[in-house]
Amino acid sequence: MMEFDTIAAISTPMGEGAIAIVRLSGPKAVETADRVYRGANRLTDVPTHTIHYGKLVEQTTEQVVDEVMVSVMRAPKTFTREDVVELNCHGGIVAVNRVLELILEQPDVRLAEPGEFTKRAFLNGRIDLSQAEAVMDLIRAKTDRAMTVAVGQIEGRLSKLVQDLREQLLQTIASIEVNIDYPEYDAEEMTQQIVQKDAGEVRRILTELLATARQGKILREGLSTAIIGRPNVGKSSLLNTLVQEAKAIVTDIAGTTRDTIEEYVNVRGVPLKLIDTAGIRETEDIVERMGVEKSRQALNSADLILLVLNGNDALTEEDVLLFEAIRGMNAIIIVNKSDLTQAIDLTRVSELADGRPVVTTSLLEEAGVTDLEAAIASLFFEQGVEGQDMTYVSNARHIQLIKQASQMIEDALGAAEASMPIDMVQIDLRRAWDTLGEINGDTAQDSLLDKLFSQFCLGK
């Protein structure tokens, strides 16, 4: 275990609340807390993994700062594998900041840097780098499924797979090195067969893993989803129905939504960042025109388009132009207002949809919403999100490293097939082995670690 100084930080979100937590970690964590703690027993004398009621006081005046419950956890069975103390004080802004100030006034303790607790857990071997990154994914998860994927990664699901692949590559590399060191055995042809078989299997698994990248990124980052359509077809009603709150103004007046409105929503485990756009149409209103331009920008950057049509009207030229604007994009066509007399040509709608899902709804009565949710989930997850038990790769850094390693193995296989010198094959496999090691942090550089952990919040 590496030697560090003692750090402290607030580990709970700022703001009003019943309880806040100040966390300490390091060789003098218990000693530091004990200096300002007054209770039935000294913290330096209590057993590990116990919690104690007491008060925090100013050392010079013995004035009470706050009542606290103190958790004492001694190394190595802690998150950082160091001595850890958590001070559970009253929530709010003033109380918890005063407790932190009291701790930082003590000698040999400093304010933690962003992500430093997790960084210490990594450097002390408690978790690897992919598990550390999954901690932030868990904090930022917007759906149950995204949380499940993050927890699986924290528990080492991706880590173990990467370790197994690196071990398989290492065995292949070792076979090559035997051939290089003992050329008199003339086993080069056999070694090439081993490379084709073993390295080929690693490449196959990496290819399967990369196939989950699109779905993994959706679960991790969400789908940017633009709701588009002519004015007053029910776009804001759709947003409010999915969010279950009145976020957008719903009136009979065309052009009411004059800007884009964004909201996150969980649709059957798929996180959507819904963007309710202003109706796209030609207008003389300067403010509405600015909203229309933002709508066009949202349309171009969206992962998914929800095109809303008015079933009570015949298709208009504006509707057809919207179909043209989303040509080739992931889209679901929503024919709204099914509770009214239908004037729309559904056959023509299906032709314009060009194989993309068409769902009929009455958002006023919330009819057809279940069908819409199913269409969204099945568009990106053929077997449904909740039913899939698999290892996802969702982190952009991991995806890039896997792509690089896969290409290096491809180069090695090509070299072996072309009967190039076996040591040339070994170089590519060794590079792939090193590249995969960056996922777990086995071969990561310090500059990368500093960059990754700086993205964490204070106290984590």
UniProtKB/Swiss-Prot annotation:
GO cellular component, one term: cytosol
Record bears the keyword RNA-binding: no
Coiled coil: none
SUPFAM superfamilies assigned to the protein according to its UniProt record, in alphabetical order: P-loop containing nucleoside triphosphate hydrolases, TrmE connector domain
EC number(s) recorded for this UniProt protein: 3.6.-.-
Cofactor section: K(+)
One Pfam family hit: TrmE_N
Keywords assigned: Cytoplasm, GTP-binding, Hydrolase, Magnesium, Metal-binding, Nucleotide-binding, Potassium, tRNA processing
GO-annotated biological processes: tRNA methylation; tRNA wobble uridine modification
Positions that bind Mg(2+): 236, 257
TrmE-type G domain residues: 222-381
Subcellular localization, as worded in the UniProt entry: Cytoplasm
Binding-site residues for (6S)-5-formyl-5,6,7,8-tetrahydrofolate, renumbered to this chain: 23, 86, 126, 460
Top-rank lineage group of the source organism: Bacteria
Cofactor: record remark: Binds 1 potassium ion per subunit.
Binding residues annotated for GTP, in chain numbering: 232-237, 251-257, 276-279
Principal cellular location given in the protein's record: cytoplasm
Similarity comment text for this entry: Belongs to the TRAFAC class TrmE-Era-EngA-EngB-Septin-like GTPase superfamily. TrmE GTPase family.
Subunit architecture: Homodimer. Heterotetramer of two MnmE and two MnmG subunits.
NCBIfam families attached to this UniProt entry: mnmE_trmE_thdF (TIGR00450), PRK05291.1-3 (NF003661), small_GTP (TIGR00231)
Descriptive protein name: tRNA modification GTPase MnmE
Gene that specifies this protein: mnmE
